[in-house]
Amino acid sequence: MTISKAHALIALAAAAALPLAACADPTSTNSSTSSSTSGTDTSTAAATTTSYDVSKIPTVDDIAALVPDEVKQRGTLRNGASADYAPAEFLGDDSQTAQGYDVDINKALAKVMGLNDGTTNHAEFPTIIPALGTKFDVGISSFTITSEREEQANLISYVQVGSAYGVAAGNPKNFDPTDPCGKTIGVQTGTAQEDYANELSEQCVADGKDKITIMPHDLQTDITTKVIGGQYDATFADSTVIGYTTNLSGGKLEQVGDIVESAPQGVAINKNDEQLTQAVQKAMQYLMDNGYLKDILATYGAQDAALTTAELNPATND
């Protein structure tokens, strides 16, 4: 995102209305539980949260043949995700099991690739890409595709998601999404929204207004708590996250303003692993072509985010 786009955001000239995804309340996932699961497999314990049944998805032999031997022998596709970002990735009702459409997508990719399972381990968001190729095979964790990230990893597009503001019910702090200057806004560390907020703040100062006080956190759930509690004016996050949270937050949080800055998100893979990249790209395209990706997203009310082409390192506008 450029400064000119930041200025347009403040004026809402760049606003684009998109459908809002909504499912269950992610505020039941507390930050201490999310943190404590780091480095442990959270995808096998029982939970009552809805998930997509991937058992009907077949193995595609031509794609399975592309999977690197190390991954084949292990039999699992290891995903790293920040499990506090519903509906994409979050902990289920048992506070241990990773749930969400990204978790199910990883399992679906594993099925197509002829593997036994796709497992998801919680990791704090900024640590995922550096761990690709060692701790994790893939990072499916709402990674907005940017030129900077494409320098760090291969990214395969699969959904298109915008950004939105969330405020405490009734907007008691009178937050104006068209003029966030001088406000305190919570963002998740390392996200596209953190970058956007910083550029918005720079534009505020350039326009002679007060800067935005940007409060980054590793866990989106911590931010939501502070917004509801009145410590922050707003949170700025993926539109699917805001929609999911506000719709079933018990009336404690609401979206304000339009959805802006729609951008593709991608599966991250180690930049040097061309073989796995090719296998995952073809597996994702298979899920798209056969309706599985859209069905998975529909389980979480996010079917409108589905893309139809699994593009490797697509051009970015930032």
Q: What is each residue range found by the language model?
A:
Residues L20-T40:
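Bacterial lipoprotein signal-peptidase II cleavage site
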Residues A24, D41-D61, K111, T184, ...:
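Extended ligand-binding regions for polar small-molecule ligands
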Residues A45-G139:
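Extracytoplasmic small-molecule ligand-binding "clamshell" domains
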Residues T50-V67, D195-I214, Q285-D318:
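Ligand-binding clefts/hinges and TM-proximal coupling segments of bilobed small-molecule sensing domains
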Residues A98-K111, F143-T146, G162-L219, A234, ...:
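Bilobed "Venus flytrap"/periplasmic-binding protein-like clamshell domains
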Residues G118-D179:
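Acidic, polar ligand-binding/catalytic clefts
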Residues F143-E150, N198-E199, I228-S262:
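A ligand-binding cleft/hinge motif common to bilobed small-molecule-binding domains
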Residues V159-V167, N247-M284, Q303-D318:
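Periplasmic-binding protein-like
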